[in-house]
A protein has these predicted regions:
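Feature captures hydrophobic
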Residues: 1-139
């Protein structure tokens, strides 16, 4: 592997935690250079339609994935329906943000501006959001 461990805090990760943890693990395996994106941060992901949440604690050598939210400790909190969260990972990026020159990027940008995808902490932590997007990106 890449020297970065993806660990699950809970014995039985919820579906969102398993999906996101697996995605990060696969991306780090396929693209070892993405290890450089890891900086200390806490990120909550909330799928409102499935009533499920996960928190990621990022570190240079480990990504800890937990069920639920980080109780106010998160630098970023992304809240959307589960389809929009998946679309976020599948959107072409430019500088770590959805590329508005691609139709998929414009669609995700519209959802962010229309608050279908809510990103709390984006203005305070834009680089964290950019690194997270590139870490999760499957494109």
């Amino acid at each position: 592997m890449t020297g970065v461990r993806v660990t699950y805090v809970d014995a039985e990760p919820n579906g969102l935690a398993a999906m996101v943890g697996g995605l990060i693990e696969a991306n780090l395996e396929r693209h070892p250079d993405r290890r450089g994106l890891l900086r200390p941060a806490v990120v909550d992901l909330v799928a409102i339609d499935a009533d499920v949440a996960t928190s990621l604690q990022l570190d240079r050598s480990e990504v800890r994935v937990a069920n639920g939210i980080a109780n106010g400790r998160a630098h970023l909190r992304l809240t959307a329906d589960s389809i929009a969260l998946v679309e976020l990972a599948a959107t072409p990026l430019r500088l770590g943000f959805p590329d508005v020159f691609h139709p998929e990027g414009r669609a995700v940008t519209r959802k962010v501006l229309g608050r279908e995808i809510r990103i709390e902490g984006l203005l305070r932590h834009p680089l964290t959001m950019s690194r997270l997007s590139r870490l999760l990106s499957v494109v």
